[in-house]
Amino acid sequence: MKTIQFVKTNDCLACEVVENIIFDIIYEGNLPTYIDVQKDTCNDAQARISMFHTITVPLLIFRVDDKEVARITGSMPADFYKTVIDKFIEL
C-alpha cells in the first residue's frame, strides 16, 4: 500500500497550491485505488516538530507499506510537486 501524507497550515499559499495539485490528480482519475492520500492541518509549529520533525510546510511524506521513502518540504515550484507525485504513482 502506498500513502501520500500532506501536511499544511491554514494560512499557507504554497499549501493551497499543493492541495489543488493533489485534488486535480484525484479528480482526473489518475490516482490508483492502492494509493491512499492523508491530509493533515497542523497550525501549531511545536506539534509539527514533534510529529514530523520539521516546522516547514507544505510537507509531503511518501510511504510504501508504512515505511517512509521520500519527503518534500517547503515552497517548491508547482511543477516539481506534480512531477514527484506522478513519479510516486508510477513506481
Say what each PLM segment does:
Residues D11, Q38, G74-P77:
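Short beta->alpha junction loops/turns
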Residues L13, D44, D79:
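Short alpha-helical
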Residues T41-V57:
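Short Fe-S-cluster ligation motifs
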